[in-house]
Structures are given as C-alpha cells and as structure tokens.
Design a protein with these regions (language model features):
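Canonical Rossmann dinucleotide-binding motif of NAD(H)/NADP(H)-dependent dehydrogenases/reductases
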Residues: 2-34
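The beta1-alpha1 cofactor-binding region of Rossmann-like NAD(H)/NADP(H)-dependent oxidoreductases
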Residues: 49, 70-83, 113
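Catalytic loop of short-chain dehydrogenase/reductase
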Residues: 139-140, 146-184
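Conserved Rossmann-fold SDR core element
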Residues: 26, 65, 91-94, 182-188
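Conserved glycine-rich Rossmann-like NAD(P)H-binding loop of the short-chain dehydrogenase/reductase
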Residues: 29-53
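A short, exposed helix-loop element centered on a Lys and neighboring polar residues
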Residues: 131-132, 176
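Substrate-binding pocket helix/loop in short-chain dehydrogenase/reductase
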Residues: 59, 107-108, 112-120
Length: 188
C-alpha cells in the first residue's frame, strides 16, 4: 500500500528530469499520473510526443496507471482540457505538480523579447494556467487538493538568467497567494 493510493496526480514537465522522477515516484506510491510533456529540448525547441508516453509505459509496466498528455501549458484552453481529461479518465484530480520549464539563458543586453517571453510563458503562465484550472476543480469538488509549484534558487538572481529568475520569482509570489487564497477550500 502506497502513500498515494487512490490519488490522481498531474505532473507538468514529466517526460524528463525532475518531473519524470516525480511522476514515477508518485505512481510507485499508488497515484494514477497524468504525464504532461511536449517532449521539447531544454531550450523549448522541437517536440517528441513519445516522451510523455514513454513515461506512461514505464508506469504501466510497473503496475501503475498513467495518461500521456502533450499539450502546451502555455495554452490556457489546452490546460483546461488537460485537467478535464484527467478527471474524465480517472474520475478526479487530487494533486498538481508544476515542473515544466525551458531555458534561454543570455545576459540582459543579449536577450531578445522572444527569449524573454518564451521562458516566462512556460514557467509563470504555465504554472498559472495549471493552477487556475485545477483550483476550480478543487473548489467545486470540496475535497481539498495539493498544488506543488517548483521554483529555483535562481529566482534570487543568477547571471545570464533574467527571464528565468523573473519567472521563478513570479512563481514564488503566485504560490504565496494560492496558499493564502485556497486554504479555505482545503487546498494546500
């Protein structure tokens, strides 16, 4: 019996790295897991839709339950559909873990607007989109929920990462507001 038996988790950026590790551990602990990942490289370029499915295959091979999702978390409506898909497929959603991210590192004087926007969109807007749609479900269901948002010590100012630092610091602020706002609904 695992600590997450009967729970349903959605993990963004779950195709590789930290997100993959979290998805696999949550499944090992008994959660059904929605594995969200575009399958892009670290810079957010290209796409391999098989990346999310490969993690689901690992989960299922170990006896767990998984569902692959390759929608971009930067797309508000697609994230809403992803949350609904989790609920339709597994009957509910209990946990959201926002890990997805990309890097476009440059010194501020070398960074263009597109590099700024791409990183902020994935990290900050993507976290907002997922939290927004999941929190509506948590509020309406009235059984609580968990939202886990990943930030980084780079939020405090890492040279060559003005976009990343701003996005990660924004996630800290968003998370504080969510904690203060959603506690009354049992969401922590």
């Amino acid at each position: 019996m695992g600590r997450l038996d009967g729970k349903v988790a959605l993990v963004t950026g779950a195709g590789r790295g930290i997100g993959r590790g979290i998805a696999l551990l949550m499944a090992q602990e008994g959660a059904a897991v929605v594995v969200n990942d575009l399958g892009t490289g670290l810079a957010g370029e290209g796409a391999d839709v098989s990346v999310a499915q490969q993690v689901v295959n690992e989960i299922e091979a170990a006896g767990g339950k998984g569902l692959a999702n390759t929608d971009s978390i930067t797309d508000y409506d697609a994230v809403g559909a992803m949350v609904e898909s989790a609920i339709d497929h597994f009957g509910k959603l209990d946990i959201v873990v926002n890990v997805a991210g990309i890097l476009r590192d440059r010194m501020i004087f070398n960074m263009d607007e597109a590099e700024w926007d791409a990183v902020v969109a994935v990290h900050l807007r993507g976290t907002f989109n997922t939290c927004r749609h999941a929190s509506t479900h948590f509020r309406d269901r009235r059984e609580g929920g968990r939202i886990i948002n990943f930030s980084s010590s780079s939020a405090w100012g890492s040279p060559g990462q003005p976009n990343y630092a701003a996005a990660k610091y924004g996630i800290l602020g968003l998370t504080a507001v969510l904690a203060n706002s959603l506690d009354r609904y049992g969401v922590t």
